[in-house]
C-alpha cells in the first residue's frame, strides 16, 4: 500500500504562487487601458487609482500632472460621462469642488487590469474611503518605491523571501449560504512596498480621537508583528509609515511607533533537543513530508504545539518587543480637516 505524502500549508501555498502567471507590470496594465481608448495620461491615472485606492480627489490628480482646475474638471467630466466614475458631493458654482471624492467603479477598467473582483470597485464606508485616500496620497508622493498593489503580488513577494503564509495577517470569511470558507491575507488592504532588502508598510487610520487612533495603531502593529519578525530574521529591514491628516496626529503616532523601534533582541540559546525539533519542522514545511514528525514527535500537531511552547518561552525571555527598524510620518496636506471634512 502506497502512502500519500501530505503537503504542508507552505508547500501548497508555494505551489499555488508558482503556478500562477507572472503579474503584469504597471506599464502593461496601463497599456491595457489605452487599448480601451484612454489616452496615455488617462490610462496612467486610472491604473494608479484602480490598483491602489479606487478613489481620489481632484487635487491629487492636479499634483501628479501639474495641471490647473480647468483641465482637471474636464478630465473628471470625461470619466463621469464614460460611466466609470461617480463623484460624491455637489459641485459648486465654479463647476469645481476640490473636496469632492471620485470613485472609480467601472468594471471594464478593473477587468482590463486583471483585478475585476478588487474591492476598490465597490462602495465603501466613509472610514474606508478616507483610509484609502490617505494611503494613496503617500503612494503618489513616493512613486519610486516598489509597490506591491495586489494581494497575490504581496504574497508572492513574501514567498520569495521564504516566509510562511502562517505569519501573514489573515482572516477567514464564511459565506451566508454555503459552507465554503475564503481565506484572505492582508485584509487591512494598505500599501506595501519591498525590494527584498527593506519592506515598507503604510498605515492610515483617521477614525476617532487620539485614544482610539492609538489603540487601532497598536492593533495593526500586533497583527503584523509575526510577519515583521520573520522579515528581520532573514536580515530584512522593516519600515513603517503612518499617514495622517494633521501634524498633531503624526506626532502622537510617531511616539507610539518609537516604542517598537530597535534591533531585534538576541536569540535565546536553545537546547540541542529544541533545535532538532525546530529544524525538523522547518524541513517538513519545506518538503511537505511529515513522516519524520510522526516517527519522532508523535505527529505534526504535537510537534507544532511543542514548537509553539519553545517560541513562547523564548519570547517571554526577550523583554519588550521591538518589531521595526525605522518609521516616518506623512501629513497628507491635501486631505487635512480644513480641506476635507471628516
Residue ranges of predicted features:
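Glycine-rich, often proline-containing surface loops adjacent to acidic residues and nearby aromatics
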Residues: 55-56, 109-121, 195-204
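Basic, Lys/Arg-rich alpha-helical nucleic-acid-recognition elements, primarily the DNA-binding modules
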Residues: 1-109
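Non-catalytic C-terminal interaction segments of nucleic acid-processing enzymes
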Residues: 247-342
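Catalytic cores of nucleic-acid endonucleases
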Residues: 205-265
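Short, amphipathic alpha-helical interaction segments positioned at domain boundaries
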Residues: 100-130
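Charge-rich, low-complexity terminal tails
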Residues: 193-228, 288-317
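Hydrophobic, Leu/Ile/Phe/Ala-enriched alpha-helical segments that form helix-helix packing faces
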Residues: 49, 76-83, 138-146, 221-232, ...
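Exposed, interaction-prone assembly regions rather than primary DNA-binding/catalytic cores
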Residues: 122-216
Amino acid at each position: 500500500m502506497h502512502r500519500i505524502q501530505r503537503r504542508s500549508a507552505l508547500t501548497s501555498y508555494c505551489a499555488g504562487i508558482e503556478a500562477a502567471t507572472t503579474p503584469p507590470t504597471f506599464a502593461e496594465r496601463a497599456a491595457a487601458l489605452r487599448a480601451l481608448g484612454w489616452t496615455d495620461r488617462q490610462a496612467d491615472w486610472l491604473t494608479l487609482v484602480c490598483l491602489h485606492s479606487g478613489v481620489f480627489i481632484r487635487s491629487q490628480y492636479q499634483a501628479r500632472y501639474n495641471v490647473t482646475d480647468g483641465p482637471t474638471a474636464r478630465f473628471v467630466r470625461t470619466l463621469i460621462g464614460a460611466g466609470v466614475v461617480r463623484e460624491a458631493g455637489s459641485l459648486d458654482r465654479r463647476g469645481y469642488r476640490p473636496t469632492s471624492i471620485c470613485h472609480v467603479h467601472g468594471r471594464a477598467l478593473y477587468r482590463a487590469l486583471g483585478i475585476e473582483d478588487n474591492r476598490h470597485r465597490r462602495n465603501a464606508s466613509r472610514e474606508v474611503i478616507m483610509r484609502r485616500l490617505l494611503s494613496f496620497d503617500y503612494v503618489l508622493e513616493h512613486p519610486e518605491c516598489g509597490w506591491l498593489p495586489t494581494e497575490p503580488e504581496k504574497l508572492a513577494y513574501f514567498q520569495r523571501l521564504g516566509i510562511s503564509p502562517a505569519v501573514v495577517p489573515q482572516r477567514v470569511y464564511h459565506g451566508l449560504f454555503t459552507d465554503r470558507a475564503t481565506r484572505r491575507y492582508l485584509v487591512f488592504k494598505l500599501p506595501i512596498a519591498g525590494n527584498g532588502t527593506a519592506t515598507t508598510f503604510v498605515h492610515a487610520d483617521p477614525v476617532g480621537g487620539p485614544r482610539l487612533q492609538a489603540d487601532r495603531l497598536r492593533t495593526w502593529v500586533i497583527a503584523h508583528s509575526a510577519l515583521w519578525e520573520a522579515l528581520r530574521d532573514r536580515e530584512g529591514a522593516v519600515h513603517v509609515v503612518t499617514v495622517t491628516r494633521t501634524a498633531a496626529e503624526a506626532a502622537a503616532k510617531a511616539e507610539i511607533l518609537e516604542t517598537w523601534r530597535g534591533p531585534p533582541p538576541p536569540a535565546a540559546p536553545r537546547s540541542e533537543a529544541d533545535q532538532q525539533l525546530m529544524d525538523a519542522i522547518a524541513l517538513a514545511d519545506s518538503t511537505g513530508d511529515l513522516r519524520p514528525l510522526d516517527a519522532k514527535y508523535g505527529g505534526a500537531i504535537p510537534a507544532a504545539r511543542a514548537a509553539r511552547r519553545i517560541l513562547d518561552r523564548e519570547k517571554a525571555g526577550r523583554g519588550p518587543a521591538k518589531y521595526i527598524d525605522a518609521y516616518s510620518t506623512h501629513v497628507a496636506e491635501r486631505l487635512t480637516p480644513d480641506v476635507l471634512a471628516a
